A protein has these predicted regions:
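Beta-strand-rich N-terminal accessory domains
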Residues: 1-77
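Polysaccharide-binding surfaces and accessory modules of carbohydrate-active proteins
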Residues: 129, 134-243
C-alpha cells in the first residue's frame, strides 16, 4: 500500500517481534504508540526519539534534517493535554514538526517491511528509510525477538561528492534511567538503556541501539537542562556538522536521551 499527502495520517506501522509489544512508525517517519511496557499506550510519544541526517558541502554549508515528512496531524494541538499543552498550543514539540524536515514524503508498506521515501529540493540527497520486523516464516523463536531493524539508503542528488551522517536518538523511557555504551564484537558502539527496577519487577526494562555502519560512535547522554535545553543543545551540535561531544553523567536521571551516529 502507498500513502502520501493527507493519507499519511492514516497509517502507523507496528514494529516489534511476535508477542513483544510494538512501537508505531507513523506515515511521516515519527515514532509513536510506545506499547512495550506491558500495557496499551496508543498516541504516546517517547520524548524526542527520532532519526536524523546531515552532510556538509565544499563551501562548508551543513545540511541537517530529521528523517520525517510534514506532520499530518492537527496544527491546533490535541484536547485535554494540560497546562501549556493541548488545543490552541499547537502540536506537541515531541512530534518534531518544527525541525527541518523533508517536503516530499511517501510511505509504502507490506508487512513485515515498510519504506519511507523522503526528498527536498533544498537537501542534496533523496533518502529511503526501511523499517522491518524480525519476521521469519516457520521460525517462531527468532520471529519473537523484541527488535526492530532499520536501513537508510542515501542517493546523492547534488553536484559534488559528500559524506553523510545519520543519527538515531532514543529516550530512556524507564524509571531510574541509566544510559551507557558498550563496544560490540563487530567493533560498533551500542547505546544501552536500562531502568532502576529489580529484574523480577513488571516495571523492569532495557533497550539497546546499535549501528552496522563502517564508522559509528555514541553520545550516551544529551545535555541535562530545563525547558527545551536537551533537544536544542543536541540540534545545535548536530547541525554544526561537528562530531557530537562525549557527554556522560554518572547518576540516574529519568528521561535521559542518547544518540548513535553512523557514517
Amino acid at each position: 500500500m502507498r500513502y502520501e499527502n493527507k493519507a499519511l495520517r492514516e497509517i502507523v506501522f507496528p514494529l516489534g517481534g511476535i508477542g513483544t509489544g510494538s512501537i508505531g512508525y507513523a506515515g511521516n517517519g515519527r515514532f509513536m504508540d510506545w506499547e512495550i511496557r506491558n500495557r496499551p499506550d496508543k498516541g504516546s510519544a517517547n520524548g524526542y526519539t527520532h532519526l536524523a541526517i546531515r552532510c556538509r558541502d565544499r563551501a562548508g554549508r551543513v545540511y541537517a534534517r530529521v528523517l520525517q515528512g510534514d506532520y499530518p496531524g492537527s496544527r491546533m494541538g490535541q484536547y485535554d493535554k494540560g497546562e501549556h499543552h493541548g488545543y490552541g498550543f499547537g502540536p506537541a514539540g515531541t512530534t518534531m514538526c518544527g525541525f527541518p524536515h523533508f517536503r516530499s514524503c511517501v510511505f509504502t508498506g507490506s508487512f513485515p517491511f515498510c519504506h519511507i521515501d523522503l526528498a527536498d529540493d533544498d537537501f542534496p540527497a533523496d533518502v529511503r528509510v526501511t523499517a522491518y520486523n524480525p519476521m521469519i516464516p516457520l521460525d517462531a523463536d527468532n520471529s519473537s525477538l523484541p527488535a526492530a531493524l532499520f536501513t537508510v539508503a542515501i542517493t546523492n542528488t547534488g553536484r559534488e561528492a559528500m559524506a553523510f551522517d545519520t543519527a538515531f536518538s532514543l529516550r530512556n523511557l524507564f524509571s531510574g534511567a541509566r544510559n551507557g555504551t558498550v563496544r560490540t564484537d563487530t567493533a560498533s558502539d551500542a547505546l544501552c538503556l536500562a531502568g532502576g527496577a529489580p529484574h523480577d519487577s513488571p516495571a523492569y526494562g532495557e533497550m539497546c541501539l546499535t549501528c552496522a555502519a563502517e564508522d559509528t560512535y555514541c553520545q550516551s547522554h544529551w545535555y541535562r537542562g530545563g525547558w527545551q535545553d536537551p533537544i536544542v543543545t543536541f540540534w545545535n551540535e548536530w547541525s554544526s556538522g561537528e562530531r557530537l561531544c562525549d557527554r556522560c553523567y554518572p547518576d540516574p536521571y529519568d528521561g535521559d536521551t542518547g544518540t548513535v551516529v553512523g557514517s
